[in-house]
Amino acid sequence: MTEAALPTLKEADALRADIYRLLASLLRQTPDAELLEWLAELTIDQDGSRLAECWQALSEAAAGTEERSAKIERLQSAHFRHLVGVIQGDVVPYASWYRNGELMEAALVALRQDLRALGFVRSEHTRDPEDHLAALYEVMAMLIDAESQEQAYFFNQHLAPWAASCCADLGQVDTAFYAALGQLGSAFMESEQARMSVNAGHVPVRIVER
C-alpha cells in the first residue's frame, strides 16, 4: 500500500497565496458570474476541519437555485450594505477601526512604515487606505509568492491583532454568501495564526475542482 503524496511546501504556500487573493477579491468587490460558478463547483476534501466546513458553506452559498444575474445583482447590493455603506457598512474592514476605534489612526501609520520598508507602493487605482483588509491580504499573497521571510512579521504585526475578529463580524451578517465568506476568513486566519506561531508546515484544506 502506498500513501497519497502530500503537497510540497511550495504547493502549500501557493495555495495559501491563492486563498489570500481570493479573500481579497471577494472583500473588495462582488464576484462575477465566472467566479461564482467556480466557487459553486468546488469539491472540498471533507477532513472534519473547520476550514473544510467553511469552504463547503461558501460553495453552497455561491450555488443556490437563484438565476445567476439576479444573484449577482443581489450580492452587489449586499456587498455595499455589509462592507461599504453610505457612511460605513455593517462591517468596517480597516485595521485602524478595529485596533484604534477610528479610521486613519496609528495602525495605518505603522502599516505604511512597514510597507515602505518592504518596498510596497500604494496603487493609484484605489481610494481605500492601505489598512483595508483586502489590501493586507494582497500583501500577504505577494510576500508568499516571493518566499519572503517577512511573512510572519507582517502577519503578526498587521493581521493577527484584528483580522479574525473582523471576519467573525462579517460572519454574522444576514446574507448567506457574505456570512460564509466571513466565517471562512476567520477560520483561515486561525489557521495562519497557528502556522506563524509554530513556524511549521501546516497545510490549508485542499480544494479540488470538479
How would you label these PLM feature ranges?
Residues 1-210:
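Surface/interface-facing alpha-helical segments and adjacent flexible terminal/loop regions used
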